Amino acid sequence: MTPTNHYAHIDYRKVIAWPPRLAREWTFLEQVFGAASPRRLLDLGCGTGEHARFLAGKGYEVVGVDASDTMLERAVEGGVPAGVTFLRGDVAQVDSVVSGLFGGAICLGNTLVHITEYDTLLQLLRGVRRVLVSGAPLLIQVLNYERLVATGQRYLPMSFIQDEAGESIFLRLMTHKPDGSVVFTPAMLRYRPDSEPALEIVSSHNVPLQGWRRPELEAALEAAGFATRVFYGTMADVPFVAGESSDVVIVAR
């Protein structure tokens, strides 16, 4: 992935309620990685490092890789506890960024859809396969674009953030294209309900994504050498239903 500043004005440490999210996901993460050997995990597209720090607190060594300088700066600001390493690099070339073998890998938070070409997706997955010990799991989570397109949904839930400068709104819009690509528009708005105008755009960018669906992901994983692939509908032991599930979650080995 090419580093961009699309998310430079968005502090994901603030716009996501991390403690309840991580607590909610832990049961599933433990189910997937509880037997990991070595207890060394790779975090692809680690962002601000919330999952890396959380998993380190559970006794894992975690190496987080991200192409964004801004994200990595915020990851370091959030703290680098023992057992955590953050590296700047292209996740599509992860096998040339990291060293050693891992007992598992995660690619969460809709990171994978920033890979917009199938050949690059395949390159990424093959690179991950090379740095995992035999049989180690790769956990992927992306939005279920099949459902989003079918229902015509073009936005994700808003977040309201209160800080010393006042109140802000984190808005995420989507435009789905016939070829499966997506124009994703994250925006930060300053909200002043007692002023005119009440809303001010702080930042707004169009981010090109590819809304990978289950069949495409399964084919790429198989081609990359992941012999088994189990699909879930969210970060829990819940079956995937194409027209209903919020997410496509995959455990591939």
Which positions does each model-derived feature cover?
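Conserved class I S-adenosyl-L-methionine
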Residues: 1-39
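Class I SAM-dependent methyltransferase "Motif I" SAM/SAH-binding loop
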Residues: 45-49
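Class I SAM-dependent methyltransferase SAM/SAH-binding core
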Residues: 52-94
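A short acidic, Gly/Pro-enriched loop at the edge of an enzyme's catalytic core
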Residues: 96-104
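A short glycine-rich, Lys/Arg-flanked "PGG" loop and its adjoining helix->strand segment in the class I
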Residues: 122-134
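Conserved beta-strand signature within the Rossmann-like core of class I S-adenosyl-L-methionine
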Residues: 135-142
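SAM-dependent methyltransferase
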Residues: 142-216
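C-terminal lobe and adjacent flexible extensions of AdoMet/dcAdoMet transferase-like proteins
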Residues: 208-253
